[in-house]
């Protein structure tokens, strides 16, 4: 069983974990090509491309200008990424066994790096998968990455001994690997969905759902979950599996108020 999640926009490069190894991303060469293209943009053009404020555009411009392939300014992405999903994961509560299990069973999709193992070193960056970066006959980042990510993930899924892919990524990122189960029909995709009961109906509450995704990652990694039936036992912070709302592909977990 392999889990995929989205990266975070918020980064923390102040923390250093020297007890964990730092590995090279699989698609470092492809990331470098993107960075070299983005270095051609001034901060104003970068802001228009990414729809960011002047302050953030300047920060991103500076990040791309100093980006390099060495580990000089890198952190393991599992440590560097912050945000609601990663808050829910609470990596600081993982023991060393949990962390190494996570490195084998979690993948983080990325606009710049394609797909990351948790121990992969990354430089500070921001490049969302949905960014309409058009260059060298590529229409956008989805076109750039095409099937590369799918083939990498098929290999990683099979290495776990269970052909289930647990999709805890946003649609923007999952779209980059959509059709992986067509490319390899042995792959079974399940998507956990988190809803809260409000005003007489179950609704997805975005911020809570993001945190719940992180909670589920933590649940899977700490309990070494490797099958769907055990996945349904997720019960952190009041969520429970709702069989009535679920089907074979979508596992719905609900929170009652």
Swiss-Prot record:
What GO biological process terms does the UniProt entry carry, in alphabetical order? response to hydroperoxide
Q: Which GO terms describe its cellular component?
A: cytosol
Pfam families cross-referenced by the UniProt entry: H2O2_YaaD
Which InterPro entries has this protein been placed in?
YaaA
**In which family does this protein belong, per the annotation?**
Belongs to the UPF0246 family.
HAMAP family, per database record: UPF0246
NCBIfam families named among the record's database cross-references: PRK02101.1-3 (NF002542)
Listed name of the protein: UPF0246 protein CLL_A2361
Q: Which organism is it from?
A: Clostridium botulinum (strain Eklund 17B / Type B)
């Amino acid at each position: 069983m392999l889990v995929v999640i989205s990266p975070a926009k918020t980064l923390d490069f102040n923390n250093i974990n020297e007890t964990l190894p730092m590995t090279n991303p699989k698609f470092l060469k492809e990331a470098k090509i993107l960075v070299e293209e983005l270095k051609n943009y001034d901060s104003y053009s970068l802001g228009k491309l990414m729809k960011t404020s002047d302050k953030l555009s300047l920060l991103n411009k500076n990040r791309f200008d100093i980006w390099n392939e060495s580990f000089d300014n890198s952190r393991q992405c599992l440590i560097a990424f912050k945000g609601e999903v990663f808050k829910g994961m609470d990596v600081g509560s993982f023991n060393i066994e949990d962390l190494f299990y996570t490195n084998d069973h979690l993948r983080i999709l990325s606009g710049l790096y394609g797909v990351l193992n948790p121990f992969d070193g990354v430089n500070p960056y921001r490049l969302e998968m949905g960014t309409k970066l058009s260059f060298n006959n590529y229409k956008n980042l989805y076109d750039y990455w095409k099937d590369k990510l799918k083939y990498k993930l098929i290999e990683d899924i099979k290495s776990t001994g269970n052909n289930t892919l647990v999709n805890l990524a946003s649609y923007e990122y999952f779209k980059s690997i959509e059709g992986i189960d067509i490319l390899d029909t042995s792959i079974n995709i399940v998507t956990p969905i988190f809803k809260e009961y409000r005003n007489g109906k179950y609704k997805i509450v975005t911020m809570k759902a993001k945190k719940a995704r992180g909670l589920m990652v933590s649940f899977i990694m700490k309990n070494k979950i490797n099958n769907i039936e055990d996945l349904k036992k997720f019960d952190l912070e009041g969520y429970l599996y709702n069989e009535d709302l679920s089907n074979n592909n979508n596992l719905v977990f609900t929170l009652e108020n």
